[in-house]
């Protein structure tokens, strides 16, 4: 189905810079997210028909569409995030490519281009309307496409009371891209039987398995002396960082793994001879494998300290989120419903693990099973990001189908 306000709504949203800041200590991490929620989303939530609309100190804008059929007793939530990834989000100037011809798309005057030779996903979209960047910023389809889709679904349901639906709760939240947005999510206040994050990629994605995730911060303490007299005295902290890294499995890196394979990912190294720091993320799907990866890093640190004769390597591990499969497999209703709705709409469900995490990873462990459904974005987090309007329309269809489902 087509929705006349969907494109303009999306274009309005992406032009607002809501980039999150991993170094911030506030919630939300940036004032722009607060302003977007209170000045743009809250008024529009009320306009499209949501009731009891409010903004919480945790950064979530919340609203409710009451059920219009007493036989539909479920309460279902839909959640999308306001923030965008760590890439330029100022001056977003989207291009709308109608009836895409399957060829190369020049991204404004930036010199960058979307070429099917480089981005095979483009082969799915001839004849469709694509929204791209102008090459100078990301687009923000992750996850403003989800916000626009949820808002449009509510608008349509309000205008069409003949479509009977259950109670719907909507939540637009902050800071998903920096991994902390759901930390303060109020599951008791949201009060639904299950929910969906509308934060996936291409048409048909339906996901209930995520990585389990941890962060590792390493400190290496060296001893700096003049290199001319260093023998037997110098301890080079940078060399310690290299030695540590070289003891990790060389093939367990993001660029060499896929599917259900986990990895260690070196994110950052800084330092000097005297002192160095390294930051890693650890990812795996199975709990035992996840725990083994953390234990392996600790074992390497302990072994190095033993060989050095002093505690020069310090490792701090922090769990970030867990595979929501552990929760959702106990009651597959949200998957069964979404799968049935997609199939009724002629959409082939693509059920595969997320090689990442969503807000649903944390919210599921708060007591609300929250799988992820497609929102349409491709090549997310950079200048090559784009989305199909037709996929966004199908996401709206899916949301409407889920809340009207009687099975």
From Swiss-Prot:
Cofactor(s) required, per the database record: Zn(2+)
Gene Ontology molecular function terms on file: metallopeptidase activity; tripeptide aminopeptidase activity; zinc ion binding
Cofactor binding notes: Binds 2 Zn(2+) ions per subunit.
Entry keyword annotation includes Zinc: yes
Keywords from the named record: Aminopeptidase, Cytoplasm, Hydrolase, Metal-binding, Metalloprotease, Protease, Zinc
Residues annotated as binding Zn(2+) 2: 142, 177, 381
Localization in the cell: Cytoplasm
Record-listed Zn(2+) 1 binding positions: 81, 142, 199
Listed PROSITE patterns: ARGE_DAPE_CPG2_1 (PS00758), ARGE_DAPE_CPG2_2 (PS00759)
Residues at the active site: 83, 176 (proton acceptor)
Principal subcellular localization: cytoplasm
Gene Ontology cellular-component annotations: cytosol
GO biological process terms on file: peptide catabolic process; proteolysis
Superkingdom, natural source: Bacteria
Catalytic activity annotation: Release of the N-terminal residue from a tripeptide
Xref: InterPro entries: ArgE/DapE_CS, Bact_exopeptidase_dim_dom, Peptidase_M20, Peptidase_M20_dimer, Peptidase_M20B
NCBIfam families noted in UniProt: peptidase-T, PRK05469.1, PRK13381.1
Family: Belongs to the peptidase M20B family.
Role, per record: Cleaves the N-terminal amino acid of tripeptides.
Name of the protein in question: Peptidase T
Gene: pepT
């Amino acid at each position: 189905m087509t929705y006349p306000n969907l494109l303009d709504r999306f274009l309005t949203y992406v032009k607002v810079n809501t980039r999150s800041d991993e170094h911030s200590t506030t919630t939300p991490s940036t004032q722009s997210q607060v302003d977007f929620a209170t000045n743009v989303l809250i008024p529009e939530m009320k306009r499209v028909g949501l009731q009891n609309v409010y903004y919480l100190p945790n950064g979530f804008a919340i609203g409710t569409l009451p059920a219009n059929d007493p036989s539909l007793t479920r309460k279902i939530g839909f959640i999308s995030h306001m923030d965008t990834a760590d890439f330029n989000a100022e001056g977003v100037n989207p291009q709308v490519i109608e009836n895409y011809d399957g060829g190369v798309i020049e991204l404004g005057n930036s010199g960058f281009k979307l070429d099917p030779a480089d981005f095979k996903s483009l082969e799915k979209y001839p004849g469709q309307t694509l929204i791209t960047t102008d090459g100078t910023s990301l687009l923000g389809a992750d996850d403003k496409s989800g916000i626009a889709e949820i808002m449009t679904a509510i608008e349509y349901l309000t205008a069409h009371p003949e479509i009977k639906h259950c109670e719907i709760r909507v939540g637009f939240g902050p800071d998903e891209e920096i991994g902390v947005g759901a930390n303060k999510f109020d599951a008791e206040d949201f009060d639904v039987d299950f929910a969906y994050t509308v934060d996936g990629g291409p048409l048909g994605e339906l996901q209930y398995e995520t990585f389990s995730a941890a962060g590792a911060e390493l400190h290496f303490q060296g001893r700096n002396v003049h290199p001319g007299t260093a023998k037997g005295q110098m301890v080079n902290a940078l060399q310690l960082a290299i030695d540590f890294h070289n003891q990790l499995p060389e093939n367990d890196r993001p660029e060499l793994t896929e599917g259900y394979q986990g990895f260690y990912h070196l994110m950052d190294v800084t330092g000097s001879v005297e002192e160095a720091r390294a930051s890693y993320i650890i990812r795996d799907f199975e709990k035992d494998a996840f725990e083994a990866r953390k234990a392996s890093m600790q074992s390497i640190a302990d072994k190095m300290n033993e060989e050095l004769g002093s505690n020069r390597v310090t490792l701090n591990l922090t769990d970030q989120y867990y595979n929501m499969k552990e929760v959702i497999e106990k009651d597959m209703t949200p998957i069964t419903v979404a799968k049935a709705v997609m199939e009724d709409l002629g959409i082939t469900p693509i059920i595969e693990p997320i090689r990442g995490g969503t807000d649903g990873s944390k919210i599921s462990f708060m007591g609300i099973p929250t799988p992820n459904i497609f929102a349409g974005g491709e090549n997310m987090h950079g200048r090559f990001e784009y989305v199909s309007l037709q996929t966004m329309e199908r996401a709206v269809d899916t949301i409407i189908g889920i809340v009207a489902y009687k099975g």
